[in-house]
Regions:
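N-terminal secretory signal peptides that target proteins for export/translocation
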Residues: 1-2
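Sec/Tat signal peptide C-region and signal peptidase I cleavage site
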Residues: 18-22
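Hydrophobic alpha-helical segments
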Residues: 16-17, 96
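Bacterial N-terminal signal peptides
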Residues: 5-16
Length: 340
């Protein structure tokens, strides 16, 4: 009898009218938000963004910026696609707990809205825990998503400099140092089919074969796999990749063709296996430049001297490389660093 009563109440409750606002905006769990985001491009509901952000905050999904890049990109994309509603959406998104206010700040900065600075200033008092972060975006010390350039590949001499213990040029935020940016770009796409976001992901594809940086190889591998996986799941992504493929430079076209083939044949797991194998091999054998350094060190001082002469033209001293033409200093240094 008790079971019947509970079942009857459940059935009756199913037919009770829900409050209109709750039916439109509330999310019960983090998974509800993810499912909504997954369908958003087919049925945009920007008015639900504030409720989604608050639900994610309540589920502690925003505490780790490195794991919340997708949500940042999505929120930024929704704001950017709805400039006439952005002010209202931000107002309803706040307040947020101190630990989660960064998401609102970054979503505004990454939105691409012409008035994003005005919006940050206007709502700065409602995000007091991120006062310094806001100031850094306003004065340019922190870059917006569109301002972050793709890391340039180091030159041959810069590679040697790095392998000999020198530090590569560092950036506060870069695709090589911040893998969450890849998630952020996907979030922007899911918010409104942002073609530019996909293009930026494509520019990282050549890193899937990088032989000198484990960080780049890892991020390039992630780009290749997420492109294949999402293209296999979503027809719009696959169609966009096929449209872009013929116009890409060779360094992008070849891995993109692999992505399209894997998506068409539903064999994305193969790409994952191949990229994991490349990462494992890199961990075992190290940088190709470093291995080449070891080989060059044994070729003979004549070859080293040629390299030194060429390097002198671009200020070898500035690179921090010891170089004595015809002497043992360079050869010894190369052998030493290659062995590390």
């Amino acid at each position: 009898m008790v079971r019947f009563s509970i079942a009857a109440l459940a059935v009756a409750a199913a037919f009770l009218p829900l409050p209109a606002q709750a039916a439109k905006t509330e999310f019960i769990s983090r998974s509800d938000v993810v499912e909504w985001i997954d369908r958003y491009r087919l049925k945009p509901e920007p008015a639900r963004l504030p409720a989604a952000v608050k639900a994610l905050s309540k589920a502690d999904a925003l505490r780790d910026p490195e794991a919340a890049g997708f949500y940042v990109g999505f929120a930024a994309g929704v704001l950017g696609a709805n400039p006439d509603k952005a002010d209202e959406l931000i107002a309803k998104m706040l307040p947020l707990p101190d630990g989660d206010q960064w998401l609102a700040v970054r979503a505004i900065a990454y939105s691409g809205l012409p008035q994003w600075r005005d919006l940050l200033r206007r709502y700065s008092t409602r995000m007091p825990a991120r006062k310094d972060m806001i100031e850094r975006y306003l004065d340019g010390r922190l870059l917006t998503l569109d301002e972050i350039e793709l890391d340039k590949s180091p030159t041959w001499l810069e590679k040697i400099h790095i392998q000999m213990g020198g530090k590569p040029p560092s950036k506060a935020v870069s695709y090589g140092n911040n893998p969450e940016l890849l998630d952020t770009l996907w979030g922007r796409y899911f918010a409104g089919s942002d073609r530019k976001a996909i293009w930026r992901i494509l520019t990282v594809l050549p890193w899937a074969k990088d032989t000198d940086s484990l960080e780049r190889l890892t991020i390039g591998s992630a780009a290749k796999y997420t492109l294949a996986n999402n293209a296999a799941r979503y027809p719009d992504v696959l169609a966009l990749l096929k449209e872009k493929e013929p116009r890409q430079p060779e360094a992008i076209r070849k891995p993109l063709q692999d992505v399209i083939k894997a998506a068409d044949t539903m064999q994305t797991a193969q790409i994952r296996k191949e990229q994991l194998a490349l990462i494992d091999e890199f961990k075992r054998t190290g940088s190709v430049t470093k291995k080449n350094l070891k080989m060059w060190g044994y070729v003979g001082q004549g070859t080293i001297a040629v390299g030194c002469i060429a390097a002198a033209a671009v200020s070898l001293t500035a690179l921090g490389l010891p170089c004595v033409i015809g002497g043992a200093v360079t050869s010894a240094a190369i052998n030493y660093w290659a062995a590390q």
